[in-house]
């Protein structure tokens, strides 16, 4: 079975830096809005283990440097399935520009987490998916919840 997800970009309507965490990241207060500008993410399972990622843009990484790949790895490391962990095939059709502040990578990661939750019948809550997503990128929880 294959699931195709649309992964919408987001914009920051406001962004206020309120401090800095001990790890160097900024504390922020922001208002975000999802927009109708999407990547397309196809996810399917196969018997053989491992993650295979392809991306329509050959300049983008198709390995553990990619947030879609890291999301799948984080999901598989967290999920408690009765059967052996499946292999995962992911294809990302990129439309959202990279490094444009539109959360394209985070949107792709959120789509992968949501699709894997459905495909594996893991029955994780949105909160649980957000916890996994937070380990992949700061904007992933917003992209899960919209």
Predicted feature locations:
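Acidic/histidine-rich catalytic neighborhood of metal-dependent amide-processing enzymes
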Residues: 134, 145-146
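Short, well-structured alpha-helical segments that form the helix of a local strand-helix-strand
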Residues: 125-136
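A cytosolic small-molecule/anion-sensing beta-strand core signal
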Residues: 9, 144-145
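Generic structural marker for isolated residues within well-ordered, non-membrane alpha-helices
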Residues: 28, 72, 113, 129-130
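ATP-binding N-lobe of GHMP and related small-molecule kinases
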Residues: 1-100, 118, 122
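DPxDG-like acidic metal-binding loop motif
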Residues: 68, 100-126, 142-144
């Amino acid at each position: 079975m294959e699931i195709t997800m649309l992964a919408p970009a987001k914009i920051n309507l406001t962004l206020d830096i309120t401090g800095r965490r001990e790890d160097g990241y900024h504390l922020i207060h922001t208002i975000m809005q999802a927009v109708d500008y999407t990547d397309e993410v196809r996810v399917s399972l196969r018997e053989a283990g491992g993650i295979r990622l392809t991306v329509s843009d050959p300049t983008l990484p198709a390995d553990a440097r990619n947030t879609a790949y890291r999301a799948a790895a984080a999901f598989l490391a967290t999920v408690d399935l009765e059967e052996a962990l499946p292999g995962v095939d992911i294809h990302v059709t990129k439309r959202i520009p990279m490094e444009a502040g539109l959360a394209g990578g985070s949107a792709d990661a959120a789509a992968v987490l949501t699709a894997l939750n459905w495909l594996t019948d893991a029955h994780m809550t949105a909160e649980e998916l957000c916890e996994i997503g937070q380990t992949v990128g700061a904007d992933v929880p917003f992209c899960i919840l919209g």
